[in-house]
Amino acid sequence: MRYKCTEIELHRNDNGKKIYFTKFFCPDSYEDRNILLVHGITSSQHIWDINYKDYSIVRFLAKNGYTVWRLDIGGYGKSDKYEDGFEVTTENAAIDVLTAMEKICELQGVNKVDVMAWSWGSMITGLAAELHPEY
């Protein structure tokens, strides 16, 4: 199967920090379903795409019709770092997730986005849902 992965320009409105944000999909099985994957505390978005046998969650979702969106929470991976490590909080991470969800809705013309998270990412998405349940 052919897959496409592109980086989307994304910055937070409140602090201007760049969020590393990618879109991954398979044109052959595209069904206009969107899912945002949120990583845990010890990794980055690349944990979702392990290039070994059938271990890639990203490729599994894409070949089953999803447009898969991933972000690196601020301070992780390729996202901008914070000068003060104590700014990497669940609250700041929830704002990163909400910024990404708003961008997905804008780009895809949708009102809601499915979410998959693990570890700390589950706490982040729970707070994001509490702050803005409309997504």
Positions of predicted regions on the chain:
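N-terminal cap/lid segment of alpha/beta-hydrolase-fold proteins
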Residues: 1-30
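Alpha/beta-hydrolase active-site loop
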Residues: 87-107
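Active-site glycine-rich loops that stabilize anionic/oxyanionic intermediates
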Residues: 32, 39-51
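Hydrophobic beta-strand anchors of alpha/beta hydrolase catalytic cores
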Residues: 35-37, 68
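Glycine-rich phosphate-binding loop signature in dinucleotide/nucleotide-binding domains
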Residues: 29, 104-111
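Glycine-rich "HGGG/HGxG" loop immediately N-terminal to the catalytic nucleophile
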Residues: 46-47, 72-88
